[in-house]
Amino acid sequence: MAMNSMCIEEQHHLEHYLFPVVYIIVFIVSVPANIGSLCVSFLQAKKENELGIYLFSLSLSDLLYALTLPLWINYTWNKDNWTFSPTLCKGSVFFTYMNFYSSTAFLTCIALDRYLAVVYPLKFSFLRTRRFAFITSLSIWILESFFNSMLLWKDETSVEYCDSDKSNFTLCYDKYPLEKWQINLNLFRTCMGYAIPLITIMICNHKVYRAVRHNQATENSEKRRIIKLLASITLTFVLCFTPFHVMVLIRCVLERDMNVNDKSGWQTFTVYRVTVALTSLNCVADPILYCFVTETGRADMWNILKLCTRKHNRHQGQKRDILSVSTRDAVELEIID
């Protein structure tokens, strides 16, 4: 555990209430939503739909992050005091950033896949196979694990001595000011994990929009639905990830040569923390936008629910039959006696 000599006197009022509320809502909604999305995308992948591979990976990434939220809820409710082991801190930070940047990668793959399907339906068919999607998804998981593995080797906790009610309390990862290795890593992530995916998604969605708008065979109502979906996808990406990365860049510039006792950038750090909470909303938006708004996705989800209901009813029927037999046997035994 690394000891940080900086003394922060911030009272954590905003984070104490905002973060737990946001994280609790995201956890309650995103866990069942992403489990459902995993089921839907698995069914789509079984139907030789390469998009299902990307959706499955996206849902898995969101679910893994959502499962760490109870730890972050506890952390923020305790005024940024990490009460668990340093290993859990490292693991939580790893899955948090793994989700941020694997999500942007898988969203980019989905945008490219839809672009090729609409604009070049025959020309690049070899890029739209399950095999290619599986290899691409596996490569993303490996690369993201490699780039984020640095978080597992660094000391992600530091001790702060400014709360008069406590002898000390432990921070997890979000140190102020940023260390040099964090600045370099953040600049790399912002370029490769945010800027390039955002540009790619916007270009692909614009090309799809133009192709759909000029397609005479598509009904106007269907065109409007597709255009609204494209706009929602782009807007969600921008709202969830842009504020965070803007604040990351600002922090990298302001804190590059900042002394540990310099509190001039603390307001910026507070705004940055709010944008971190905002990124968690992506876990809720992804399954809704990518799995449950399409007719195929809704149909698959409905089939899953019917299957589960049928199994439940069959199980209840079996229990009633067993109970009936048991009661009849008991009556027969009483007669024999």
UniProtKB/Swiss-Prot annotation:
Gene behind the chain: Gpr65
Disulfide bonds: C7-C162, C89-C172
Membrane topology (Cytoplasmic): 45-48, 121-128, 215-218, 294-337
Membrane topology annotation: Multi-pass membrane protein
Protein species of origin: Mus musculus (Mouse)
Keyword entries, A-Z: Cell membrane, Disulfide bond, Endosome, G-protein coupled receptor, Glycoprotein, Membrane, Receptor, Transducer, Transmembrane, Transmembrane helix
Induction: By glucocorticoids, during apoptosis of immature thymocytes.
Full protein name: G-protein coupled receptor 65
Gene3D superfamilies: Rhodopsin 7-helix transmembrane proteins (1.20.1070.10)
